[in-house]
Every structure is written in C-alpha cells, then in structure tokens.
Amino acid sequence: MKTLLLTLVVLTIVCLDLGHTRICLNQQSSEPQTTETCPNGEDTCYNKTWNTHRGSRTDRGCGCPKVKPGINLRCCKTDKCNQ
C-alpha cells in the first residue's frame, strides 16, 4: 500500500511538472546570447523592439511588460522562444 501511494505521488509530480521554471533569452540587441531562469510562477518570455537614432534596439527577458506606443512587443510561453 505504501509503495502504491509513493508511486502515485511520484507520478503526479512528473505529470504536473511541478517546479518547472521558464528559461528566457535576456540579451539586448546584438550582444552575445545569454539566458535567465525566470522566477517561480513566471511562465512568459518577451522580445521588444523599437527604433532609435542609432537604429533598431531589442530587449529580451522574463515576463510580458506593458510598453509605450511605437514599441513592438512579442510574448511567448516556451523556453528560449523570444529570439
């Protein structure tokens, strides 16, 4: 009986993927690719792009921030989806 209970607990943890955290890219513009592990409960990555007098700029990270008009924002929910 204890073995059955333990098996059910392990199966539940595996199936629910408890504790999984999202991994997002977090480099800016043309910097080398880096990643960050998002805080628990944060399951979204973002990629925002805007134009400046120096050209197009890109910022990436965890979450899905509100942006001002003129900034293109793309949010997604898989690891490293914010290319």
Swiss-Prot record:
Asked if Phosphoprotein is a keyword of the record, the answer is no
What InterPro entries would the database entry show? Answer: Snake_3FTx, Snake_toxin-like_sf, Snake_toxin_con_site, Toxin_cobra-type
Where does the record place it? Answer: Secreted
Q: List the disulfide bonds.
A: 24-45, 38-62, 64-75, 76-81
Q: Does the keyword Signal apply?
A: yes
Position of the signal peptide: 1-21
Name the organs or tissues of expression: Expressed by the venom gland.
Q: Name one GO cellular component term.
A: extracellular region
The record's GO molecular-function terms, alphabetically, read: acetylcholine receptor inhibitor activity; ion channel regulator activity; toxin activity
The UniProt keywords, alphabetically, are:
Acetylcholine receptor inhibiting toxin, Disulfide bond, Ion channel impairing toxin, Neurotoxin, Postsynaptic neurotoxin, Secreted, Signal, Toxin
First-listed, main subcellular location of the protein, grouped into a coarse class: secreted
Task: Write down the superkingdom of origin.
Answer: Eukaryota
Family annotation (SUPFAM superfamilies): Snake toxin-like
* A Pfam family recorded for this sequence: Toxin_cobra-type
Query: What functional role does this protein have?
Result: Binds to muscle nicotinic acetylcholine receptor (nAChR) and inhibit acetylcholine from binding to the receptor, thereby impairing neuromuscular transmission.
Membership in a protein family: Belongs to the three-finger toxin family. Short-chain subfamily. Type I alpha-neurotoxin sub-subfamily.
This one is known as Neurotoxin 3FTx-RI
- Which organism encodes this protein? Bungarus fasciatus (Banded krait)
Q: What is the lineage of its organism?
A: Eukaryota, Metazoa, Chordata, Craniata, Vertebrata
